[in-house]
């Protein structure tokens, strides 16, 4: 089930909306929060202050849907402002890091409905923490898909068009586009500066570590 149809008063829950960029995550988050406001529930909305693309005091979708929000520097700041809320919305959850997990759990245990939207994969198509862990503890999960700009297929990956250092580079269409699995891989292979495509879950080889250990022992003997 992706969204609760009915919950008992005081029953907390966690809802997670994940997908690539341009897949409608923020639009879906705004839709749920507006429905809660129409139902006259007390709503508090948060986003990380690193997300300054469109507005400092609002969550804004790529299609310009917006709803007022509060910017926070770290996940723990949410607890200071959410005490009276019945429904809590959090956009761009991946930017708040693993510290978001205990915050969300605490809010749900307090009987609050918590809705988190964010990227489940980074620009290399690797799991973007803490979203995979949030998926594991959520009662309700929604996976949104974009449209591949290359072939028009359903897209679940975010392709970085320009070479920038670092995992987190905040930007819009000038930097990122949605791609399907095939077109994402083709783009990565065609980029001379891109990291090699491999198994994101592969464990690092033990051989380099063994060589370093042997070299260290030899230095101590000398």
Language-model segments: what does each one mean?
Residues 2-83, 122-133, 146, 162-164, ...:
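Conserved P-loop
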Residues 12, 39-41, 110-112, 137-140:
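Short glycine-/polar-rich loops that comprise or flank the Walker A/P-loop
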Residues 32, 102-110, 130-137:
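Catalytic-core regions built around general acid/base machinery
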Residues 82-96:
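Conserved P-loop NTPase "ATPase switch" module shared by AAA+ and STAND
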Residues 89, 113-120:
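Structural recognition of the conserved hydrophobic beta-strand(s) that form the central parallel beta-sheet
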Residues 92-107, 121-128:
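Conserved ATPase-coupling elements of RecA-like P-loop NTPase cores
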Residues 140-149:
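Conserved AAA+ ATPase "SRH/arginine-finger" region at the nucleotide-binding site
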Residues 155-163:
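Short, surface-exposed amphipathic charged segments that create phosphate/polyanion-binding patches used
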């Amino acid at each position: 089930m992706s969204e609760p149809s009915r919950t008992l008063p005081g029953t907390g829950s966690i809802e997670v909306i994940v997908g690539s960029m341009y897949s409608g995550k923020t639009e879906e988050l705004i839709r749920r929060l507006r429905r809660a406001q129409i139902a006259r529930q007390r709503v508090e909305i948060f986003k990380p202050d690193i997300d300054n693309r469109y507005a400092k005091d609002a969550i804004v979708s790529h299609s310009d849907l917006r709803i007022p929000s509060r910017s926070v520097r770290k996940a723990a700041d949410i607890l200071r402002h959410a005490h009276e809320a019945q429904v809590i919305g959090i956009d761009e959850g991946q930017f708040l890091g693993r510290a978001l997990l205990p915050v969300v759990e605490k809010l749900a245990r307090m009987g609050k409905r918590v809705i988190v939207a964010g990227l489940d994969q980074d620009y290399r198509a690797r799991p973007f923490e803490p979203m995979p862990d949030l998926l594991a503890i959520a009662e309700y999960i929604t996976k949104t898909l974009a449209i591949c700009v290359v072939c028009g297929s359903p897209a679940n990956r975010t392709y970085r068009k320009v070479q920038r250092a670092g995992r987190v580079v905040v930007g819009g269409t000038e930097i990122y586009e949605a791609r399907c699995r095939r077109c994402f891989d083709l783009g990565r292979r065609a980029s001379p500066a891109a990291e090699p495509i491999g198994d994101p879950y592969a464990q690092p080889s033990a051989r380099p570590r063994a060589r370093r250990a042997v070299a260290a022992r030899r230095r101590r003997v000398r």
